[in-house]
Amino acid sequence: MIDSTTSDMIPNSFVFDLHSDIATDVSLRRARGERKVFQRIFCDRLRAGGVQGLISVLWVEPQYRQRSPERLLQLLGSLLSDVEESSDCVQIVTDAKALANTIRQGKIGLFLGVEGMTFIEQWPLLELPRESDEGFYERFRQPLSVLGKAGLRHAMLTWNEQNQLASGSDSSNAPRVVAEGLTPFGREVTRELHRRGIAIDVSHLDDTSIDGVLEEVDGTIIASHSNARTLCEVPRNLSDRHILEIGRRGGVVGINAYAGFIDSVQPTLDRYIDHIVYVAERIGIDHVAFGFDFTDYLETQELWHTAEPEQRLERVEDVPRLLRRLTERGFSKQEIDKLSYVNTLRVMGKL
């Protein structure tokens, strides 16, 4: 857990983002020949938003899905190289104390995560067993060991697709390649992630797969970037029963700033805060955090066209506006600190 020593090491309040796709942009820029992307572009932007800690995920884009291991290692190599080149402002961390030390040095701390694990079923020399294969479950640990040496602290079994581990939240109309929900392989991987102390993230899983994770792991889980389905009825958001279960297990729900998960008509800053209020009313403020999922630096369409400029939350520079509005809505400084970093550090300290 985050103890008083760790708390005392943090000089000021800061914001932790439970979900960032920055690694994707870093990889694309480096492929074009750019270097020190964090130092030149992202560190100043993150500081402007008060964000000093985040989970930086490796996400294999759909166009690379048939060669996931290769793309995953490209993303990992790009991220590690850029962090090394930008070491004056950013550092990979693996626990709460390391993050606190990094912040004290004036740097930004990155926890390494993976957004989807299709790569594990395609890993070289790893073929899914057709019959009893005692060596199979030992071989699948190889990619986890490779990532573990790089500092992996977080994992999602799938993105929106269905793979050989689980069903994604957007795979309901796709051809079924395995039975709906967690597969036996997915259950084994889930148990191994838990054994290694890696944060298991149920964002992007469909309801049946979330149920499977809950059956396999009787401990803390997170939903890094998901909202309340009751307020915005899309499959990517969480049902009330899953929100309650995450809270019961001591986890956190990171509220997502992606417009389509906030409201279908008015995805405003205040509606974002409504999701915070809704989840906090059900499981307590100690189990809510920020998982912004900002994509303004990627080639995406503008999704905030229905919101007035002062009601937008679409880039990291908008985070101070969110904090001010939380104060105006009646949140205390202690509550805002819990949302911003205290809850996340507590959970990461449990793993």
Each language-model region and where it sits:
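Loop-centered beta-sheet repeat module
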Residues: V178-L214, A223-H225
